[in-house]
Amino acid sequence: MENSEQLVWLHGEPQATGSLKSTAEDFLVVEDLGFQPDGDGEQVLVRVRKRGCNTQFVAEMLAKFARLPLRAVSYAGLKDRHAVTEQWFCLHMPGKETPDFSSLELEGCDVLEVIRHRRKLRIGTLRGNHFALVLRQVSDRNEVDARLAQIAASGVPNYFGSQRFGRNGNNLEQARLWANNDIRVKERSKRSFYLSASRSAMFNQVASARLAGQQAKTVLCGDALQLTGRGSWFVAKADELETLQVRLDAGELQITAPLPGDDELGTQDDALAFEEQALTGQETLWSLVKRERVEPARRAVLLYPQQMQWEWQDDVTVAVKFWLPAGSFATSVVREVLHSQQDIDIGA
């Protein structure tokens, strides 16, 4: 399900409106690697603050400056150009001197830190991101205040943002054409985008159905449950439901929904039947990820922002800060707060 307006809200549809982003400075994203760089090694980590530049462009410029092939430059996640972001890039430079990046001139970008590291930075290496947003022209301060408090206590749906599906859902449109053999997709990056969009749409559809049935916080027989903060999961057995529900309520466990691939969904019994029913209508996308032998995975249905705080600058402007784990979308938080005049989706 790619249209965010069709997705169910956890706290009911917001009544307030506002502007998510008037300037790039109203959307600040700072990467959290989750580890301290080693200080030595074959890799050179470069922390860059960028405005108006997308991740791939900066990677290309760093490669050119350091006289490296583009394949020698990596990063942990993509960041949108319509924001101020602090992001790490990794340059593979064995046996080479660390470049003097003080002479790098790139409009909208500043090098903040350079340090050696032993391991390559790869997609998904990231622990999470710190977000600092400013919501302006808020129509109802009391409503937004109450919803922010609800979110801090109870979380939000862990939906993929519309950015995942491309402009006007183009990635999904192309994925369906590809699935039906109406087009050929040779570029590896496009194949990845289309497959990712397909799985994300199916996840959103199952997660939304779970919320619609008031079952986002109720363990079903056969559910795939994730240990909070961990990627591993296990299947809920019928004789364990009461105990598992207590652990879920205590925050130790999270219910997951599928990122379908070429194998089974992972759930069993009641949960499997629910997910298969929820995926009705997505046969084309499901057949594509099976055909392309994509590895299946699971993702938590709910997202719990950490370190959440907010401060009103005046009656119509609120600054909101929080931390999200890698792969989560800040706009999944914002869509539970208010209807935004601009839908800027920045995840990592």
Swiss-Prot record:
Entry EC number(s): 5.4.99.27
GO molecular function: RNA binding; tRNA pseudouridine(13) synthase activity
Top enzyme category: isomerase
GO cellular component: cytosol
Keyword terms, alphabetized: Isomerase, tRNA processing
GO biological process annotation, one example: tRNA pseudouridine synthesis
Catalytic activity: uridine(13) in tRNA = pseudouridine(13) in tRNA
UniProt-annotated binding residues for substrate: 27, 129, 329
tRNA processing in keyword set: yes
Domain of life: Bacteria
NCBIfam families xref list: PRK00984.1-4, tRNA_TruD_broad
Function as written in the Swiss-Prot or TrEMBL entry: Responsible for synthesis of pseudouridine from uracil-13 in transfer RNAs.
Family note: Belongs to the pseudouridine synthase TruD family.
Protein name per UniProt: tRNA pseudouridine synthase D
Organism field: Pectobacterium atrosepticum (strain SCRI 1043 / ATCC BAA-672)
